[in-house]
């Protein structure tokens, strides 16, 4: 009779407590355990639900009103969710009515603010519902501290990242921030993305934008995202650029400091 052998230790197992990522799932023969398989199906269903969840701007509008912030509710050129998913280009532009409404807002209240903020549902309205209000509070506090003027917050249904370029251009803002629901992952249906563009103009590519991703409770905190955004905005205004020419060095250690001299962490997969 053969002696039972102990399965090899999974080097990833202890990391499950540190991340919601699908690692160290175990196995049952050549397949996944039933529990892991069911968790996968649930995560997939949650991701699909997040994509199709309708954007409800009313609670965010109420919060902004309580803070004394003006907001404008707009719609992209994609008339519904089905068209939005089939035609990404329509989500990058305002509808004709929305563009005219924004021109009217600029004519009445004036343009030329330092910073315009756009909130768009993107591919996860759930992320916007959960995190946009708190992130806007950090942005407002940052702007107040730096003395930056703010345009009205624009809330956009069926919007994609590039729609911020048109909004920023119509508002004549120096820079635009887009808060948008990111494409849901299997462990993150509510991840909020933040995109910064200096001198926004229709036709900009992704190369002109800086991205701060995965803003959520289990990812990047609001405070950490605000810290990175503060660095990027200050540098964008100082250097008059954004995108690939502007690197996020907010946490870069300074030469000669204790932080810079610390040894690099060991690879946990290597033996001690």
Curated annotation (Swiss-Prot):
* Gene3D superfamilies found in the cross-reference section: Ethanolamine ammonia-lyase light chain (EutC), Ethanolamine ammonia-lyase light chain (EutC), N-terminal domain
Q: What Enzyme Commission number(s) does the record list for this chain?
A: 4.3.1.7
Please state what class of enzyme this protein is.
lyase
Its cofactor is: adenosylcob(III)alamin
For this protein, the record's InterPro entries field holds: EutC (IPR009246), EutC_C (IPR042251), EutC_N (IPR042255)
Q: What assembly does the database describe for this protein?
A: The basic unit is a heterodimer which dimerizes to form tetramers. The heterotetramers trimerize; 6 large subunits form a core ring with 6 small subunits projecting outwards.
PANTHER family for the chain = ETHANOLAMINE AMMONIA-LYASE LIGHT CHAIN, ETHANOLAMINE AMMONIA-LYASE SMALL SUBUNIT
Write the protein's name. Answer: Ethanolamine ammonia-lyase small subunit
> What organism is recorded for this protein?
Xanthomonas campestris pv. campestris (strain B100)
List the lineage, top down: Bacteria, Pseudomonadati, Pseudomonadota, Gammaproteobacteria, Lysobacterales
């Amino acid at each position: 009779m053969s002696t039972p052998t102990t399965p090899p230790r999974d080097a990833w197992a202890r990391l499950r407590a540190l991340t919601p990522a699908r690692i160290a799932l175990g196995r049952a023969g050549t397949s996944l355990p039933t529990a892991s398989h069911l968790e996968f199906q649930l995560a997939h269903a949650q991701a699909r639900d997040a994509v199709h969840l309708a954007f409800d701007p009313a609670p965010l509008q109420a919060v902004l009103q309580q803070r004394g912030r003006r907001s404008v509710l707009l719609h992209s050129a994609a008339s519904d969710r089905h068209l939005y998913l089939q035609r990404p280009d329509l989500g990058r532009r305002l509808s004709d009515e929305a563009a005219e409404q924004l021109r009217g807002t600029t004519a009445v209240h004036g343009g030329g603010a330092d910073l315009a903020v756009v909130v768009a549902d993107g591919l996860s309205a759930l992320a916007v519902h959960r995190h946009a209000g708190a992130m806007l509070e950090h942005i407002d506090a940052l702007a107040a501290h730096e003395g930056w003027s703010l345009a009205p917050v624009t809330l956009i249904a069926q919007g994609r990242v590039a729609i911020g370029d048109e909004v920023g251009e119509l508002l004549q803002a120096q820079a635009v921030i887009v808060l948008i629901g990111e494409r849901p992952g299997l462990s993150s249906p509510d991840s909020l993305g933040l995109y910064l563009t200096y001198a926004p103009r229709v036709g900009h590519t992704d190369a002109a934008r800086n991205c701060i991703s995965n803003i959520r409770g289990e990812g990047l905190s609001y405070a950490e995202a605000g810290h990175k955004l503060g660095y990027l905005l200050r540098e964008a205004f100082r250097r008059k650029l954004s995108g690939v020419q502007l690197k996020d060095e907010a946490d870069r250690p300074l030469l000669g400091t204790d932080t810079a001299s610390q040894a690099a962490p060991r690879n946990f997969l290597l033996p001690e």
